[in-house]
Amino acid sequence: MNKKILETLEFDKVKALFEPHLLTEQGLEQLRQLAPTAKADKIKQAFAEMKEMQALFVEQPHFTILSTKEIAGVCKRLEMGADLNIEEFLLLKRVLLASRELQSFYANLENVSLEELAFWFEKLHDFPQLQGNLQAFNDAGFIENFASEELARIRRKIHDSESQVRDVLQDLLKQKAQMLTEGIVASRNGRQVLPVKNTYRNKIAGVVHDISASGNTVYIEPREVVKLSEEIASLRADERYEMLRILQEISERVRPHAAEIANDAWIIGHLDLIRAKVRFIQERQAVVPQLSENQEIQLLHVCHPLVKNAVANDVHFGQDLTAIVITGPNTGGKTIMLKTLGLTQVMAQSGLPILADKGSRVGIFEEIFADIGDEQSIEQSLSTFSSHMTNIVDILGKVNQHSLLLLDELGAGTDPQEGAALAMAILEDLRLRQIKTMATTHYPELKAYGIETAFVQNASMEFDTATLRPTYRFMQGVPGRSNAFEIAKRLGLSEVIVGDASQQIDQDNDVNRIIEQLEEQTLESRKRLDNIREVEQENLKMNRALKKLYNELNREKETELNKAREQAAEIVDMALSESDQILKNLHSKSQLKPHEIIEAKAKLKKLAPEKVDLSKNKVLQKAKKKRAPKVGDDIVVLSYGQRGTLTSQLKDGRWEAQVGLIKMTLEEKEFDLVQAQQEKPVKKKQVNVVKRTSGRGPQARLDLRGKRYEEAMNELDTFIDQALLNNMAQVDIIHGIGTGVIREGVTKYLQRNKHVKSFGYAPQNAGGSGATIVTFKG
């Protein structure tokens, strides 16, 4: 379809109305590329997809899609042989996760019959091994230790060397305390240094890395740690090399699947776009129209999507009707009506819902042409009439029986008599060629043409003579009438003058009286139709509300019953457990004889109801099914505490899992599903201390930034106690630099604590003097 009509009807602004409902960049790109088509099968497919998505939302009203970024460029780089960086891998990881979530959602979907959408859901690929490989990159853009054995080894050595450096420096802090300006370890140029008083600079052998602004403090790296620091620098280089190798290796593993991943991303975007269309339907009370095979258009209560508080109107453009001529004065909404028809057709042929009532029908047109508004060319020095006529001549050479034509103020800008004659001649030419046309004009001569000519119908926009304002209601079948005399009289013009003017009009040619009667009949019919529609809408709302309420009650009933059964079982188990403990205590005190204990326990058991058989409960069966591991599930390996992805199940029941670059064989008891872990309730504590194996993952830390001094000291005391209870070897305390009050308080507290083996500032790349690393005694 020609681009000019899309610009004239502001189709890009209409598409922008759908953007807030999109979740993916792929969906946004597909929306921006959306254009009308004349292929019936494509339009039908788009309509069917929207209807199925509506049915899906009935069962799953909170259906959503994981947000994803555009990856077309990333996949193209892979296909060209390039290696990806961490950020690009995270984009791919997100797409694979979104794909897997959609597959899981589809697998568990019930009570919805899908055909078109099923095709897209089932075309999504499953990449369990790649998902396992990509677990090596966490969301913060960090390569995990388990990405390779070599990386884990290097990082362990770095950690051990850094610990040695800290131990040496802590010993020197104690030995050389009188020579230091502060009893802390500082960091300069990435090296751990001691703040030595300038007068003692020659007493401590080592490398000078910095001098304070006052010159009183010299920052010296002691000779004892220089070699260790050089080893750490070398290990850091090895770490960078190993990370680069991992990026190359995973790039090679992903490369053969680049096209499939790109295809998955497109499908995710397509499903997102369909979802956005349905969210628009819900928000704007839009509908999926029916498709006519013979260019018949029937729009019920149609509105212009870009006009605020637009008046809804009916338009009936039957199969045999060739032209609708809208007559009447300007500013009544004729042009808006013209654009509403054109824009509704463009939206429908683009596979979008329309702002109309149920039962609306649209046709299929290969082209839509329009001459709307003042498009005169200043460069060509064309008048308004010449500009319009140039455009119309061009259009008349292109239109055919498969076109829809919209003409605004046909014949305007020249002598009224000649303009009206030209307008009628153009309309007659279009009628004979059977080209569907909607035209607006203010020439009264065209009213007679509409009445006398077959397959042509008059129409007008209603005008309220009481308020002297247009109502913007479309009146099909009723030509526009002049209200000049009535308006002049209401505005205060002398009745004598108005009477003289009325007598000058030839009564034989005055059709205003007939038009007035037609208007009254049309208004009466519209009122009846509106009443019928109101009743239909109320019935429809009532039916939907009752159905929704019935389904909700059933679901709530089943949920509450299951909760009650589970709670009852828990209470009984707790009571029996407590009774056992009580009887055990009594027995230990020899207050009861053994047979009396048995009898007492039997009586307590009678208090417990029979266990309810929940084996046939569908909700519990579904929950149990969800908990069973399957290929593609994310897991946590219990012995290592690392994440991976299940890739296959062996004949003996064991599972193969991809954990970074390492493939492992595990029994079901050796791992937990990530989803199952997320479902467990997490107890909230004021201070959390996480016990971790040395060298693996982030260390436990406490952040005191922004705290008041008293509050910070209380939290520090609680934190240290928790760390000691959990047998922590080392913790981090982030206090910031600021005024130094909290930092000094932390230092004094640690100096007093008998469980602290050593402490010092963190490396420059881990917070420097804004953080303190604490090591506890064994």
Swiss-Prot record:
<keyword id="KW-0699">rRNA-binding</keyword>
<protein>
    <recommendedName>
        <fullName>Endonuclease MutS2</fullName>
        <ecNumber>3.1.-.-</ecNumber>
        <ecNumber>3.6.4.-</ecNumber>
    </recommendedName>
</protein>
<dbReference type="GO" id="GO:0043023">
    <property type="term" value="F:ribosomal large subunit binding"/>
</dbReference>
<dbReference type="InterPro" id="IPR045076">
    <property type="entry name" value="MutS"/>
</dbReference>
<dbReference type="InterPro" id="IPR002625">
    <property type="entry name" value="Smr_dom"/>
</dbReference>
<keyword id="KW-0067">ATP-binding</keyword>
<keyword id="KW-0255">Endonuclease</keyword>
<dbReference type="Pfam" id="PF00488">
    <property type="entry name" value="MutS_V"/>
</dbReference>
<dbReference type="GO" id="GO:0072344">
    <property type="term" value="P:rescue of stalled ribosome"/>
</dbReference>
<dbReference type="InterPro" id="IPR005747">
    <property type="entry name" value="MutS2"/>
</dbReference>
<dbReference type="GO" id="GO:0004519">
    <property type="term" value="F:endonuclease activity"/>
</dbReference>
<keyword id="KW-0238">DNA-binding</keyword>
<dbReference type="GO" id="GO:0030983">
    <property type="term" value="F:mismatched DNA binding"/>
</dbReference>
<dbReference type="InterPro" id="IPR007696">
    <property type="entry name" value="DNA_mismatch_repair_MutS_core"/>
</dbReference>
<comment type="similarity">
    <text>Belongs to the DNA mismatch repair MutS family. MutS2 subfamily.</text>
</comment>
<dbReference type="GO" id="GO:0016887">
    <property type="term" value="F:ATP hydrolysis activity"/>
</dbReference>
<keyword id="KW-0378">Hydrolase</keyword>
<comment type="subunit">
    <text>Homodimer. Binds to stalled ribosomes, contacting rRNA.</text>
</comment>
<dbReference type="InterPro" id="IPR036063">
    <property type="entry name" value="Smr_dom_sf"/>
</dbReference>
<dbReference type="InterPro" id="IPR046893">
    <property type="entry name" value="MSSS"/>
</dbReference>
<dbReference type="Pfam" id="PF01713">
    <property type="entry name" value="Smr"/>
</dbReference>
<dbReference type="Pfam" id="PF20297">
    <property type="entry name" value="MSSS"/>
</dbReference>
<comment type="function">
    <text>Endonuclease that is involved in the suppression of homologous recombination and thus may have a key role in the control of bacterial genetic diversity.</text>
</comment>
<dbReference type="GO" id="GO:0019843">
    <property type="term" value="F:rRNA binding"/>
</dbReference>
<comment type="function">
    <text>Acts as a ribosome collision sensor, splitting the ribosome into its 2 subunits. Detects stalled/collided 70S ribosomes which it binds and splits by an ATP-hydrolysis driven conformational change. Acts upstream of the ribosome quality control system (RQC), a ribosome-associated complex that mediates the extraction of incompletely synthesized nascent chains from stalled ribosomes and their subsequent degradation. Probably generates substrates for RQC.</text>
</comment>
<dbReference type="InterPro" id="IPR036187">
    <property type="entry name" value="DNA_mismatch_repair_MutS_sf"/>
</dbReference>
<feature type="binding site">
    <location>
        <begin position="328"/>
        <end position="335"/>
    </location>
    <ligand>
        <name>ATP</name>
    </ligand>
</feature>
<dbReference type="GO" id="GO:0005524">
    <property type="term" value="F:ATP binding"/>
</dbReference>
<dbReference type="InterPro" id="IPR000432">
    <property type="entry name" value="DNA_mismatch_repair_MutS_C"/>
</dbReference>
<dbReference type="GO" id="GO:0006298">
    <property type="term" value="P:mismatch repair"/>
</dbReference>
<keyword id="KW-0694">RNA-binding</keyword>
<feature type="domain" description="Smr">
    <location>
        <begin position="702"/>
        <end position="777"/>
    </location>
</feature>
<keyword id="KW-0540">Nuclease</keyword>
<dbReference type="GO" id="GO:0045910">
    <property type="term" value="P:negative regulation of DNA recombination"/>
</dbReference>
<dbReference type="InterPro" id="IPR027417">
    <property type="entry name" value="P-loop_NTPase"/>
</dbReference>
<keyword id="KW-0547">Nucleotide-binding</keyword>
<dbReference type="GO" id="GO:0140664">
    <property type="term" value="F:ATP-dependent DNA damage sensor activity"/>
</dbReference>
